[in-house]
Amino acid sequence: CVQHNWGGIENLSLIPGTVGAAPIQNIGAYGVEVKEVIKSVTGIDLETGLFRTFLNHECAFEYRDSIFKSKLKEKFFISSVTLTLTKKTHRINTSYGAINDVLKQQHITTPTIQQVSDAVIQIRSSK
């Protein structure tokens, strides 16, 4: 996505795990949470065997929490996550200090989506 200039998840670069686990925990890093780009989550209700789709507002996202981690824990298997990424109207989030520091060191004042992702990867790789 980042390589094709689709924005929204660049600050989440290099977070370990799977796409299906991302909404369970509402993963986040460097000023961005996955709930900001999730359009819907689809999966199987393990009690009925039926597929169900939850729209973003039905996922009860909170800080590192969601309906899949609480009410539906061990009752719902996530099979797909639909994201809404942006290209032309994307607002770069460099509010996290470490990202700004890396970009300043590289003399980047108007970063691209790729440059923010690269900065996040550099920060994560240095830990």
Q: Where are each of the predicted segments found?
A:
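Anion-binding (especially nucleotide phosphate/pyrophosphate-binding) glycine-rich loop
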Residues: 1-47
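Phosphate/pyrophosphate- and phosphate-bearing ligand-binding catalytic cores of soluble enzymes
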Residues: 52-127
